């Protein structure tokens, strides 16, 4: 039987390729996108589950456009209609079936996401009174003392989890202007990553 010997140069190149591949895989970042639901219908009874208003439907489309190139692998929503409708345009375009999470056990939820989607991008849609809790659960900074104002509809939070466990938080506006609070300067994209600044078309 004839034995074929591989040239030493080829073996060295193969070794380098495998080494770089392993390094790349181990150095992957996990990105969690967190956003509150879009504008809801307000002229209903307090105990009802409102849908999105016309402005909210437009914002849901803006969210899909904003995250179009981010390769979202999973989308999580609460049991309320307004979060599912906020996710719908992106879910449809990305061919993802949103999953429902329980927002009363956020620490467990966050640990599960980090474990199951290492190196991937995940979108989590919450509410004005849970967005800060979600950030805390994922180990990120909490930029506002307690919760978002109910009128803070246009903020998109990006939590980057590095392979060494370090977290980075960046906040951006998206869609039509609709907020009460202003993004703290230290979390603005141009402060964290000046090379990635893009014009705010709606501001």
Sequence positions of predicted segments:
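Short helix-loop capping/hinge motifs at secondary-structure junctions, enriched
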Residues: 165-167
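Long, charged/polar, surface-exposed segments that mediate recognition or autoinhibition
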Residues: 128
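Residue-level marker of intrinsically disordered, low-complexity segments enriched
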Residues: 1-4, 14, 98, 169, ...
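Bacterial Sec-dependent N-terminal signal peptides
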Residues: 1-29
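Residue-level preference for the first positions of well-ordered beta-strands
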Residues: 32, 121-125
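Active-site-proximal alpha-helix that buttresses catalytic centers in soluble enzyme cores
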Residues: 28-117, 131-137, 141-147, 152-156, ...
């Amino acid at each position: 039987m004839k034995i074929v010997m591989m040239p030493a140069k080829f073996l060295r190149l193969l070794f380098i390729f495998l080494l770089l591949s392993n390094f790349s895989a181990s150095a992957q970042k996990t990105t969690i996108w967190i956003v509150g639901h879009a504008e809801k219908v307000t002229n209903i009874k307090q105990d009802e589950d409102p849908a999105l208003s016309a402005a909210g439907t437009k914002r849901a489309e803006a969210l899909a456009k904003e995250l179009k190139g981010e390769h979202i692998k999973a989308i999580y929503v609460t049991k309320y209609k307004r979060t599912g409708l906020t996710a719908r345009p992106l879910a449809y375009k990305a061919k993802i079936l949103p999953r429902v999470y329980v927002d009363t056990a956020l620490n467990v939820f966050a640990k599960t996401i980090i474990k199951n989607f290492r190196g991937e991008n995940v979108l989590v849609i919450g509410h004005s009174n849970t967005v800060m809790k979600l950030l805390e659960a994922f180990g990120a900074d909490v930029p506002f003392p307690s919760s978002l104002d109910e009128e803070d509809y246009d903020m998109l939070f990006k939590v980057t989890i590095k392979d060494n466990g370090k977290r980075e938080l960046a906040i951006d506006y998206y869609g039509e202007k609709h907020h009460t609070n202003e993004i703290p300067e230290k979390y603005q994209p141009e402060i964290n990553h000046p090379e990635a600044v893009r014009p705010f078309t709606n501001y």
